[in-house]
């Protein structure tokens, strides 16, 4: 949004962003064994993992239904220049390979530096690792904004969040239960609040458009949260 104001489609506002809010709430309840079930520790167990995967299947069905109906109307300014299929496949494979290996090197290097400074693994995961694994989304969304394809920019972020919570965490927890460790309810609440902020900004402000000042506000909120995590160390 700082690069180029992002207009949010009606379907995104009424269905997809609420899905992100729902995914955050589902994760909050799945990860709160101590508060809700009087358990000994907060853990995302196998049953929780299956619940998350069930929501992922619902999300897939919704996505396929949209695809069959042709999706939202695309304005002239959002049309993407056609590219030969072979070239598209080549770009996808090459880009994925670069992102996978580059992201792995970034995360390993950043984690090594953080551990040498005595920073906890939960803070590493919430800041450096999260930032490193989000670089592909950042690059994709910024590029889409520069090419005036706001639907791709915001859809990339929403889809990534839903995929990570429902599928990645769902698969991981189903294979092996995931203790929450140093991640507490404040972190989960911040995640829910960020999704609500995106919905409120898009719905109540200027013509369902996330403007540059609002983009700056979101960045300031993230910097403040990161500073809080570091200060707690």
Where are these regions (language model features)?
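Hydrophobic alpha-helical segments, chiefly the membrane-spanning helices
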Residues: 1-233
